[in-house]
């Protein structure tokens, strides 16, 4: 039976579709078609895939309508575990919400459920915690997202941030092996480790340059993206 795991960038696309009231089914179909050109040439169709198996969490978000875009913590965990090479535990997420980033994620925004941006924030924590302690994560979140109950003061929304750094990672991981690839021309500049940091930081700087932010804000946001990548 075929499984349907997706990359971080693809997950960001689904979250953006949910947030912007686009059809999640259409967004998911686009991702599936992009990944299965060979099977399509052999006559296998998206409709056939849908009729055989789709993870329950994907069925759930496909069925969301209008203001019903909230996710329980268990649903966020299930969704996060559809990202390639990711294993999020429900216990960890409970600890983040109740203790580690309690003041930054705030309370559920849609009834008893969490918003798409809150879900993205938890996915960002999952990526950052391999490099940073929670004290550092909280400091970055305070600077980038400011008041957790007011989206208007965010330097960038959590979903957009998740999409930004996952896009950079995929650009540098063209063969999808979770190892960033560096061009030979750049390889000559310095040793591999330093050069990798240089390339990631350069791409992060280019990404934040498009946002209307102060120099300090751009610097912090670029550093956060570099760490997440």
Language-model features: locations:
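Phenylalanine-focused residue identity feature
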Residues: 4-5, 49, 58, 123, ...
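Detector for methionine-enriched segments
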Residues: 1, 11, 18, 28, ...
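Basic helix-turn-helix/winged-helix DNA-binding cores
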Residues: 15-135
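N-terminal intrinsically disordered, low-complexity, charged/polar
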Residues: 1-47, 203-206, 212-229
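Intrinsically disordered, low-complexity, charge-dense segments enriched in Lys/Arg
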Residues: 136-229
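Intrinsically disordered, low-complexity regions
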Residues: 8, 12, 68, 158-162
